[in-house]
Amino acid sequence: LAENIHTMAEKGPGRVSPFMVPAMITNMAAGQVSMLNGFKGPNYCPTSACATAAHSIGEAAEMIRRGVASIMVAGGSEAVITPIGIAGFNANKALSTRNESPETASRPFDVSRDGFVMAEGGAVVILEDYEVAVSRGATIYAELIGYGLSADAHHITSPAPGGEGAGRAMKLALKQAGLAPSEVNYINAHGTSTHAGDIAETMAIKSVFGEHAFKLAVSSSKSQLGHLIGAAGAIEAVICVLAMQHAILDRKS
């Protein structure tokens, strides 16, 4: 989009690419996967900012639970590091200004955090009905047993005070999974390294887990990767699966 806006300004509307619209609409990410592989089942792309990839995985799991599909491809990708993308987040004062020490700029939950570092990337997981996976001898890396989502209904960028929305989502996930808060031992936090966001998330964790919150291991992968915006949930889901596979937690936060 940014490239074509520049082209139109410099050379006129006749030079805008005919592929601009197909390239920028979000549903084409899933559309390309279906066309390349001949997948004809449910196909759509959630658009929910930093929760997009997590919603993609969660909604794909719900499709399987409802019997709509037995196998789903889900994930997210992001390519937001453009002049206009950087300028937009900078205008919101969401980015770290620790330019003199970029390697320490992304510091979730640190008292001196001052914003996030933008990143790009993507990840995809294959979700499958358990019985189908077993019947075909598939390697099962992890089981998704609970999913929850909610809305703050508060502000366009700031989380609700006290982390009410995030807490509600975690409670719903625990309820669906049939788990007590005390049965959880690790949380891969959203942890963007923003002042308001990290406070709200910390309060949400404490509200859901109570005293057990102080026994939990909590870390944010963004301390190492930066913030992958729409792809964050998929990347971090893969990190959690690998952590279980190798019995190594991401200790950075």
Annotate each predicted stretch with a short phrase.
Residues 252-253:
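Conserved small/polar residues in nucleotide/adenosyl-binding loops
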Residues 100-177, 186:
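Condensing-enzyme catalytic core mediating Claisen C-C bond formation in acyl metabolism
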Residues 1-44, 90-93, 197-211:
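Active-site-proximal gating segment of KS-fold condensing enzymes and close homologs
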Residues 8-19, 36-46, 103-111, 150-151, ...:
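Glycine/charged-rich beta-loop-alpha catalytic/anionic-binding loops adjacent to active sites
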Residues 29, 56, 128-130, 162-178, ...:
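Short, well-ordered amphipathic alpha-helical segments that serve as non-catalytic structural scaffolds
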Residues 29-30, 34-78, 116-138, 227-249:
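Active-site-proximal alpha-helical scaffold in enzymes
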Residues 154-163, 192-209, 214, 228-235:
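Short glycine/threonine-rich loop-to-helix capping motif typified by GTGT followed
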Residues 76-113:
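Phosphate/pyrophosphate-binding betaalpha-module
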